[in-house]
Amino acid sequence: MPDELTEPGRATPARASSFLIENLLAAEAKGAGRSTQGDGVREEEEEDDDDPEDEDPEQARRRLQRRRQQRAGSGPGGEARARALGLGPRPPPGPGPPFALGCGGTTRWYPRVHGGYGGGLSPDTSDRDSPETGEEMGRAESAWPRCPGPGTVPREVTTQGPATGGEEAAELAEAPAVAAAATGEARGGRRKKTRTVFSRSQVFQLESTFDLKRYLSSAERAGLAASLQLTETQVKIWFQNRRNKWKRQLAAELEAASLSPPGAQRLVRVPVLYHESPPAAAGPALPFPLAPPAPAPPPPLLGFSGALAYPLAAFPAAASVPFLRAQMPGLV
């Protein structure tokens, strides 16, 4: 019993080894060698029979091409070799579905997939590959979007090319005009106002009027504008600017006064402490009449930056001035 169980176990690898890739390739190579030997003999016979002396070179080339296709497609794996060599049936150039070697390529061989290989899709071997039929190719081409071939031109470009090109040219021509209009509008909105240049006589008249009145009524503004040959708007704007300048000057003066020391701007009044004596008091004592006294000057107002005031009585020369003045006529 154990010997009988072990013998099938040993035979299983032998049976499974027949499906290995090396065995399959070896069998395929043997079949290809036999077919090439038979094809060589048939080719020699056909060349002896089908080569007329007066055959055209173009016809000879076509005949040789057909022989190569027949020779490549015969035997096991012939279709795969024809597909690899590009000798299979060549469809017209044009778009094709995926799995083709480029749109409009030389081959139209599509690997068939079947279910049941592990529950998924398994491609068949190269021996079972075959070109698609006309119906299948039509369905495949209609299911997938077409892409242009080497010598084809896109339909949209040929049909709508001139129209779209004209529209693009018109849009490009209109673009600078639109940009220029937009910049013109922007510049128009940002345009600076022109400044009015006043003459000296106009400025003098305006300044004198401003010293009298800070604000003008509409009638006064109209009369002043007519006399100065200006518009009422110009006179109005000038007075507005002048009032703003006047307010800034007042604010600057107040700020300077607040920052200066407190005793620097104080004014001090200094009274005059002497008076000339009347002539009646000195008349009887003197043998000659006195000259009439000079009129007394008005009391001066002296201002000092400091806080101290110095009276004139502190100076003896200033106190003896009347006596010297009274004695000067006698000395002469």
Curated annotation (Swiss-Prot):
Region spans: Disordered: 28-170
Listed SMART domains: HOX (SM00389)
Principal localisation: nucleus
UniProt xrefs under InterPro entries: HD (IPR001356), HD_metazoa (IPR020479), HMX_Homeobox_TF (IPR051300), Homeobox_CS (IPR017970), Homeodomain-like_sf (IPR009057)
Tissue: Expressed in neural crest-derived tissues, including, nerve ganglia and cranial mesenchyme.
Annotated function: DNA-binding protein that binds to the 5'-CAAG-3' core sequence. May function as a transcriptional repressor. Seems to act as a transcriptional antagonist of NKX2-5. May play an important role in the development of craniofacial structures such as the eye and ear.
Protein name listed in UniProt: Homeobox protein HMX1
Species in which this protein is naturally found: Mus musculus
